[in-house]
Amino acid sequence: MKYKILVLDLDGTLTNNKKEITEHTLRTLIDAQERGVKIVLASGRPTYGIAPIAEKLELKKYGGYILSYNGGEITNWQTGELMYANVLDADLLPYLYQCAKDNDFAIVTYKDKYVLTEHPDDEYVLKEAILNVMETKKVENFLEAIDFPVAKCLIVGEATRLAELEKVMYEALKERMGVYRSEPYFLELVPKGIDKAQSLAVLLEKIGATREEMIAVGDGFNDLSMIKFAGLGVAMANAQEVVRESADYITLSNEEDGVVAVVEKFMN
């Protein structure tokens, strides 16, 4: 089988522990694209937070795609077209805001290059902004500032207390939206059914390709669905155990250019 599409998670997969793409990985992926391989970057990050990596890999030149917000949005990076978007119900936003406020946590959402929040100096808000190479923007009233469709909100704060809030919010909202922690201090609030595999199915249909032509590589729990979905599902050596158990193949770790090993073995 000739694999034509390479789907890559970012943190812990494409990037090393310093959140950088090594020169070896970069060269390998440019070469693969020269040979016609299409790259899809699939991450929980907002679109703007993935953009620097898309530029580094020259996805605009080679016609790659971005799956942001864990599959909440699909963008054709060459044309800039938003191919798919799944957004939060606007009527849920006041409840999310109140949950954060009542527990003295900051809540954020994203617009263009900004992380919008009432608490721009909060240490966890700053952590999220730095991770995504975005700027914080202070708003006086979070709910009034949202005059656009929201792909994701994030409540941030101290891990132990946030875990308690997660339980309460999950029980209250599980029929209507997704509530889970991506880091001990980050509580993700996303539309129901957001899933990398589901969005990849949408992308494949739009570009006329099959999942048998696709390799998906990841390390985290949110990569599980796409690893099971792809023609070849690959786990990094540093992946969570359940991810490694579900994969067709286990490559080297993100500190050992594991993505390079996949391309050299299956796409040369």
Predicted segments with their positions:
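Residue-level signal for inorganic ion chemistry
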Residues: 32, 43, 70, 153, ...
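Hydrophobic packing residues within well-ordered alpha-helices of enzyme cores
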Residues: 25, 50-54, 165, 169, ...
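Short active-site oxyanion
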Residues: 36-40, 64, 152, 212-213, ...
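Asp-based phosphoryl-transfer active-site loop
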Residues: 2-18
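Short, structured coil segments at secondary-structure junctions
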Residues: 57, 62, 70, 172-175, ...
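Mg2+-dependent phosphoryl-transfer enzymes with acidic/Ser/Thr/Gly-rich catalytic loops
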Residues: 1-5, 22, 188-268
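Active-site phosphate-binding/coordination module
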Residues: 23-123
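Conserved acidic, metal-coordinating active-site core of Asp-based
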Residues: 99, 103-217
